[in-house]
Amino acid sequence: MSRYRGPRFKKIRRLGALPGLTSKRPSPGSDLRNQSRSGKRSQYRIRLEEKQKLRFHYGLTERQLLRYVRIAGKAKGSTGQVLLQLLEMRLDNILFRLGMASTIPGARQLVNHRHILVNGRIVDIPSYRCKPQDIITTRDEQRSRALIQKSIDSSPHEEVPKHLTLYPFQYKALVNKIIDSQWIGLKINELLVVEYYSRQT
């Protein structure tokens, strides 16, 4: 299944706010999750919607998300928590959380177009997994810096999560540590996502 490129407002009406996909928010009363035709949602549908929230927020294909679930399942600790940490430490997501891009698709474009360096080297893989002490900078070119500055200026000025430090005047950021669960950028029940995939096998 390919990455979603359809109408974004349709998805947030169905699933609720997805800040990684779009800065828009569903208007009060427009949330279709509470307007199921059958009245009460089935447990399967609840798990499916949580999985879809995760997938659309982080801009993943079905295959990519399944791969992350499998990696998390083999790691020590809670599978759901490890899954969220893996997704949050992706380069495209970190650029979004820093305010260097207004959405994760926008951050992905910055990376794909080679505007971003990690530890002094150009990285053009949006899924690159950032590590503590990684230094993220923009290319020393006017266009690269102009794109970043535009995003920083237009960002809603939300607090940068504690695992990151942004130096906006230097177009630079530091990854301090692996993200803690309370700083995850999405309201999600990750256990339902893990349950969804465990019931598919």
UniProtKB/Swiss-Prot annotation:
Gene designation: rps4
Gene3D superfamilies cross-referenced by the UniProt entry: Ribosomal Protein S4 Delta 41, Chain A, domain 1, RNA-binding S4 domain
Family, per entry: Belongs to the universal ribosomal protein uS4 family.
Positions of the UniProt region annotated as Disordered: 15-43
SMART domains given in the database record: Ribosomal_S4, S4
Name by which UniProt lists this protein: Small ribosomal subunit protein uS4c
Free-text function comment from the UniProt entry: One of the primary rRNA binding proteins, it binds directly to 16S rRNA where it nucleates assembly of the body of the 30S subunit. With S5 and S12 plays an important role in translational accuracy.
Subcellular location: Plastid, Chloroplast
PROSITE patterns associated with the record: RIBOSOMAL_S4 (PS00632), S4 (PS50889)
Top-rank lineage group of the source organism: Eukaryota
GO function terms (MF aspect): rRNA binding; structural constituent of ribosome
Entry GO CC: chloroplast; small ribosomal subunit
Ranges for domain S4 RNA-binding: 89-150
Organism: Ceratophyllum demersum (Rigid hornwort)
Subunit comment: Part of the 30S ribosomal subunit. Contacts protein S5. The interaction surface between S4 and S5 is involved in control of translational fidelity.
Pfam family, one: S4
Signal sequence annotation: none
An example Gene Ontology biological process: ribosomal small subunit biogenesis
Keyword vocabulary terms for this entry: Chloroplast, Plastid, Ribonucleoprotein, Ribosomal protein, RNA-binding, rRNA-binding
